[in-house]
Amino acid sequence: MANSSSGMAVDDECKLKFMELKAKRNFRFIVFKIEEKVQQVTVERLGQPNESYDDFTECLPPNECRYAVFDFDFVTDENCQKSKIFFISWSPDTSRVRSKMLYASTKDRFKRELDGIQVELQATDPSEMSMDIIKARAF
């Protein structure tokens, strides 16, 4: 179903792959992009379970917006193994204004399609989504 405010639809693959990340942990991360020609949010890249946070950040284009989810594993102060699913809205300062507006107007609707997101992060440059920030937001 298309989003009335931005006219964007969400490809079923987005929801299916997110469910696999959440339930089966088949992926470490998923990068999504808006395909303007077809007015739809689609899966751009799937990160394998052995890929790192650096692998994830390197696949975000420096001049284009993206949405992403990252499954972050960590150990608490009580020595418990935990995991949190981050939703990251990547909107670099150098991206086109139209693109930033499109991603901003579609974000909430798209996020609602992904049931199970625990932490949301918005970043306009890599420093705003450093590993230190991810760790701080996870706890």
Swiss-Prot record:
Keywords recorded for this protein, A-Z: Actin-binding
Gene Ontology BP terms: actin filament depolymerization
SUPFAM superfamilies: Actin depolymerizing proteins
Expression tissues: Preferentially in mature anther.
CC terms in the record's Gene Ontology section: actin cytoskeleton
CDD domains: ADF_cofilin_like
GO molecular function: actin binding
Highest taxon listed in the record's lineage: Eukaryota
PROSITE patterns (alphabetical): ADF_H
Domain spans labelled ADF-H: 5-139
Family to which this protein belongs: Belongs to the actin-binding proteins ADF family.
Function: Actin-depolymerizing protein. Severs actin filaments (F-actin) and binds to actin monomers.
Protein's UniProt name: Actin-depolymerizing factor
Species for this entry: Lilium longiflorum (Trumpet lily)
